[in-house]
Amino acid sequence: MELKTKSGDPARQRTACVVVGVYERRRMSEAARAVDAASDGYLSHLLRRGDLEGEAGQTLLLPDCPGVRTDRVLLVGCGRERDFNERTYRKAVTAAARALEQAGTGEAILFLPELPVRGRDVAWRVAATAEILETTLYRFDTYKSDPRPPRRPLRQATLAVPRRADLRRAQPALTLGQAAGRGANFSRDLGNTPANICTPGYLGEQAEALAQRFDGVRAEILGPAELEEQGLAALLAVARGAEAPPRLVVLHYRGADDDQAPVALVGKGITFDSGGISIKPSASMDEMKYDMSGAAAVFGAVHAAAEAQLPLNLVAVIPATENMPDGRATRPGDIIDSLDGQRIEVLNTDAEGRLVLADGLAYARRLEPSEVVDVATLTGAAIIGLGHHRHAVMGNAPGLVRDLLQAGERAADRGWELPLDEEYDEQLRSPFADVANIGGQPAGTITAGCFLQRFARGLRWAHLDIAGTAWKSGEHKGATGRPVPLLTHFLAGRAGWTL
């Protein structure tokens, strides 16, 4: 989708559709009042008649609004004016995007970014609108024999800002928001691709394609022989039962001087998780193709950083394998080595994500990053604790954790911090090895974080457990693209971009 910004009078726009907001109790936004004045009170008449109540997310398409130059006017409900906030704003933009696509307008000028949102400026509104337009209209029909795309999809949208002086701040915000949305959609494509296609080798191919697409991106792929030579024993231990060979995918993005230390992202890339010998129940096992959502999020963040041309250096490390049962597979009770040098007692082969991340973190340390953030669908306990709304966030650097949480607030992609106290770490003691890979049922998300912390020695490190947020089940089944928006805003902050 092509996105632009402008400033102007909604009644004077020559376009297929102008989008304006209407609150409850027949209260109109400034743009709606301008259209109402030009149409000799036409909107007021419709609102008095009850054609639109103004509830958040309601829409009403007017094909022949008198007195204006646009072909159509789309009214979007914004709820009660005094309660209008970030959540209501995003709901209104989402409803507008869907209504425009359904109407087949092809293009539109949205005056929603002119709406005042408590605590947020015009740059935030433009970035949020751009991201929502990209993600709301996402479709994944690659493997349907008759996909039937929209007859006239929304191909161009212009975001109107209140004053011409706002355009200077609106353009970089538009760039960042659209990059976050496109990065999230790229992540969703990877997550939704079935595991018979999205193998570790496929992720390597996607990395090479990303390097071909964007200047400043370079891909490095390590296969089984290189992994053995480099000593990534924990990753190889998880891969023993799989037919598909493992990979370590490394993406380098250079947007700053070479002497600037990179930010490192490490993404769990389990392209299918059967549980291994500790096999999972069959119900919903198809959703275990999403166990590479951490890797997909890291891919999406690199995509967003490269598209926005963020002025920072970034490295992404993705340990990728399947976790399958086989006569060669790692067994419960086995003791395995790791790149870090610590030996791990594997008490449960379905706690494999932390094993590949252990090697991923150790490999990232070799690249001398300024800080490391790992992303993983790591524990079902995260769903018990936080449901499907917030990511679990942990780390050994309070400032880094704070910045991630604040980025999540800006992006409406929120996290919640959990502790990593020593008492939790004690649950990982093993009588036979340096550490056990599970700490029992209590506080499973925290003990998983404690395990990773042992392999993040010497690093400023944070961990995002996205087990509850990476995909949806049921009627709207599919990858969400989270936490790409959070990561994009975090990286933008590290690059000196602020909204």
Curated annotation (Swiss-Prot):
GO biological process, one term: proteolysis
Pfam families named in the record: Peptidase_M17, Peptidase_M17_N
Stored InterPro entries: Leucine_aapep/pepB (IPR011356), Macro_dom-like (IPR043472), Peptidase_M17_C (IPR000819), Peptidase_M17_leu_NH2_pept (IPR023042), Peptidase_M17_N (IPR008283)
Cofactor descriptive note: Binds 2 manganese ions per subunit.
Main location: cytoplasm
Zinc keyword on record: no
Positions annotated as active site in the UniProt record: K280, R354
Subcellular compartments: Cytoplasm
Residue stretches in coiled coil: none
SUPFAM superfamilies recorded: Macro domain-like, Zn-dependent exopeptidases
Substrates-to-products reaction catalysed: Release of an N-terminal amino acid, Xaa-|-Yaa-, in which Xaa is preferably Leu, but may be other amino acids including Pro although not Arg or Lys, and Yaa may be Pro. Amino acid amides and methyl esters are also readily hydrolyzed, but rates on arylamides are exceedingly low; Release of an N-terminal amino acid, preferentially leucine, but not glutamic or aspartic acids
Record EC number: 3.4.11.1, 3.4.11.10
Requisite cofactors: Mn(2+)
Family recorded in the similarity comment: Belongs to the peptidase M17 family.
The protein's name in its UniProt record: Probable cytosol aminopeptidase
Organism: Halorhodospira halophila (strain DSM 244 / SL1) (Ectothiorhodospira halophila (strain DSM 244 / SL1))
Taxonomic path: Bacteria, Pseudomonadati, Pseudomonadota, Gammaproteobacteria, Chromatiales
